[in-house]
Amino acid sequence: MAVPITVLDCDLLLYGRGHRTLDRFRLDDVTDDYLVTTYGFPRPFIDYLVDLLGASLSRPTHRSRAISPETQIMAALGFYTSGSFQTRMGDTIGISQASMSRCVTNVTEALVERASQFISFPRDERSVQGLKDEFYNLAGVPGVLGVVDCTQVNIKAPNSEDLSYVNSRGLHSLNCLLVCDARGSLLWAETSRLGSMQDNAVLHQSELSGLFETKMHKQGWLLADNAFILRPWLMTPVQIPESPSDYRYNMAHTATHSVMERTQRSLRLRFRCLDGSRATLQYSPEKSAQIVLACCILHNIALQHDLDIVSESGATSLEPEEECVHMEPLESEAYRMRQELILTHFS
């Protein structure tokens, strides 16, 4: 059960009643264009979040200066979409960095409590088949339940001696495991793995791996690049294609897998706090992982509201990550299954 949280206006204590504080901000006082330009989302989306999170962000209080759920959400959206507690967001709604930080923490926790409501694989047979059909329509690969990949999100160094979060580029980060559908909606998100871990190790240690090993492998498979090991439920490209069928399969695999690249770009374009080219998340690894997950949840809610990222102009390009290519066991069950897939559908 969600625990209601009250956030008090720290700016009243810092500046007195003459200071313009967050609880004076009203959605009705600004235009729709202003909301989209400043906070990244239109009014109906923000209203939906207020209805969704309001009970978790407020409770009866004898203090008159408690920050309302509406304005807490605006503060958090301002951070997610700009990546900064300072300047633009602070000036826009007139609060201190401390107040912004507390609002971000509380909204993030309220979203994370609802993760399973917005990020999950379909369960009923009709929805599962619809998922496969949408992937098949992309490039002709049958049986696909999702596209899986990992992405690095930069964070501040936990401490000077801990190298477990240092990735292959020498930066402290989280290695986040994502699965998306054909539209780019996230079906799975694990955001707390160490930046030093290889992608295949992240998948191997995840709950997702156990889920497919025990149950979902009977329904279909995921697609992944060659940073992952070929498995009966995880189809990777042919490393050394020899036949026209191999090449056709690889081309279809690449075309299907590209939906994950677009999804990652959309996340970083919409939520600038994840864009490592600007800054790193200035939180502990645990809180940073929650922020990443909150952004994933908001990404899915945005898609439910038909708020796709229309233009990618100005988007940061994804930096190529070092790929550890694994040798393919030619006699494995997974290899035989992929060969059967290629012969049946790409010959």
UniProtKB/Swiss-Prot annotation:
Main location as per UniProt: nucleus
UniProt-annotated binding residues for a divalent metal cation: D149, D199, D225, E261
UniProtKB keywords: Cytoplasm, Hydrolase, Metal-binding, Nuclease, Nucleus
Tissue specificity annotation: Detected in adult eye and in embryo.
Top class in the EC scheme: hydrolase
GO (cellular component) term, any one: nucleus
EC numbers, comma separated: 3.1.-.-
Cofactors, names only: a divalent metal cation
Example of a GO MF term: nuclease activity
Domain spans labelled DDE Tnp4: 148-300
Localization terms from the record: Nucleus; Cytoplasm
Similarity remark: Belongs to the HARBI1 family.
Function: Transposase-derived protein that may have nuclease activity (Potential). Does not have transposase activity.
Protein name: Putative nuclease HARBI1
Gene: harbi1
